């Protein structure tokens, strides 16, 4: 090959490399490599979080997460009271030495992406992760997905600050960390992508979509290599019996919305009562909550920790109406107690739990009224699970995808879509668009209209006025003014 051709090829490669790895918001090569890095880091953080919780549950209750409710029902009464109380006491002591006096979650990630230039404090993230591991490992009635997302986002924020990336690139990578954490937690890469776009980023764009997909794949691969490739819930394969059931799915969406509103109102009430609650010393609040949760667990051990065993059994139609209805009430109460006691709270798992119990109850009632038309209560449990989670999270698309991916049952797609859409619409009529927006509103940050709307509403004229100008007398000549 002639020398001039060699020279042309070398120049082309240099230009391509420079263009691919240029410094800026959307350098494709740089963002792609960083998305892979962030996805791997967040994926390992999520599975480490999961494995530590599982190990502590085994130590605390002698059983795995998958059999916690069954195993706890055979324990002595003092054991069920003692373990959550001690877990709360340990976290109370930890938070006493922490500036924020509480754990952080998804709302903090949304705030960072919207108005704080993607800045999350690494110490806050690590303290929240340790506290959540202790709490979930000792039976606190909350979810692990919110703390896992916050941990992944915090580590991503630390990476972006270390590399001194600009805010636009940092926001994309923050979404990458969130997507990877969700994907690794649920073995659900598609849902992880849309969770990050729908909840954290707040919009869909090609330059954002591609890196987030790469990060979600990286997080999923890490999870499948170390934990395995299986759904979170093993369910019977269900089919919709009749198209006459569609009005029932619509009605279930309305009922799910009302239950979701009650759930979120209860959580919001604890925020409004925070001044009175804080009259109790910080360090003892979590242990009081732990004791109360242990007391409820004496009668209903299903509410302990994440509650995946109980949720799975409801999805398989194993619970009677006499147990399903009380579990809805006690899970809401237990989650509110956890939130009030500064135990932090991931709302996704409680939402799945409440929705599964609600849907199962609805399915049993529908079957008793229309025995030849109604499907299995397990099918309604899946539909209810998606409807309540969509309403609470304010993210119907990603929630529906998570439900499909964690159950591997796509036969109920239309039913879940109907109930989720109805639940989201009805909830928005009575309340904030999501639990996370409610948390931010309580902090004085209202993002219903998006980041731009909030910034415009919070800005003052004085912030944009310039006082650096010259004055001249009205009698001065044009020549003097030009000078």
Predicted segments, located by residue:
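Alpha-helical transmembrane segments and immediately membrane-proximal extracytoplasmic
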Residues: 1-458, 462-483
């Amino acid at each position: 090959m002639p020398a001039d051709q060699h020279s042309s090829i070398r120049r082309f490669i240099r230009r391509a490399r420079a263009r691919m790895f240029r410094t800026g918001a959307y350098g494709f090569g740089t963002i792609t490599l960083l998305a892979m890095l962030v996805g791997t880091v967040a994926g390992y953080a999520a599975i480490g979080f999961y494995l530590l919780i599982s190990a502590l549950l085994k130590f605390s209750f002698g059983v795995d997460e998958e059999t916690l409710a069954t195993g706890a029902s055979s324990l002595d009464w003092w054991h069920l009271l003692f373990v959550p109380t001690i877990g709360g006491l340990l976290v109370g002591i930890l938070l006493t030495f922490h500036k924020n006096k509480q754990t952080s979650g998804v709302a903090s990630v949304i705030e960072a992406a919207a108005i704080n230039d993607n800045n999350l404090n690494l110490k806050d993230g690590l303290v929240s992760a340790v506290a959540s591991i202790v709490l979930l490992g000792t039976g606190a009635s909350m979810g692990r997905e919110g703390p896992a997302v916050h941990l992944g986002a915090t580590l991503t924020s630390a990476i972006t600050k270390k590399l001194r990336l600009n805010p636009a690139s940092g926001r994309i990578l923050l979404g990458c960390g969130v997507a990877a954490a969700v994907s690794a937690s649920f073995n659900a890469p598609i849902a992880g992508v849309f969770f990050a776009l729908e909840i954290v980023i707040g919009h869909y764009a090609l330059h954002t979509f591609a890196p987030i997909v790469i990060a979600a794949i990286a997080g999923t691969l890490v999870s499948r290599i170390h934990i395995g490739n299986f759904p979170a819930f093993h369910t019977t394969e269900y089919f919709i019996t009749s198209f006459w059931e569609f009005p029932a799915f619509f009605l279930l969406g309305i009922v799910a919305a009302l239950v979701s509103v009650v759930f979120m109102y209860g959580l919001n009430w604890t925020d409004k009562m925070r001044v009175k609650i804080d009259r109790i010393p910080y360090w003892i609040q979590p242990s009081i909550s732990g004791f109360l949760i242990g007391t409820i667990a004496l009668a209903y051990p299903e509410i302990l920790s994440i509650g995946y065993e109980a949720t799975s059994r409801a999805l398989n139609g194993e619970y009677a109406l006499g147990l399903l209805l009380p579990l809805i009430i006690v899970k809401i109460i237990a989650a509110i107690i956890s939130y009030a006691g500064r135990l932090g709270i991931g709302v996704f798992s409680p939402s799945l739990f409440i929705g599964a119990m609600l849907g199962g109850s609805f399915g049993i009632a529908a079957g008793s009224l229309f025995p030849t038309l109604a499907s299995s209560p397990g099918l309604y449990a899946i539909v209810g699970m998606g409807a309540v989670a969509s309403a609470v999270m304010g993210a119907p698309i990603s929630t529906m995808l998570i439900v499909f991916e964690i159950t591997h049952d796509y036969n109920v797609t239309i039913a879940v879509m109907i109930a989720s859409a109805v639940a989201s619409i009805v909830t928005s009529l009575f309340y904030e668009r999501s639990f996370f927006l409610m948390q931010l509103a309580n902090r004085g940050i209202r993002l219903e209209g998006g980041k731009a709307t909030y910034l415009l509403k919070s800005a003052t004229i004085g912030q944009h006025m310039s006082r650096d100008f010259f004055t001249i007398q009205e009698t001065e000549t044009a020549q003097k003014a030009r000078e």
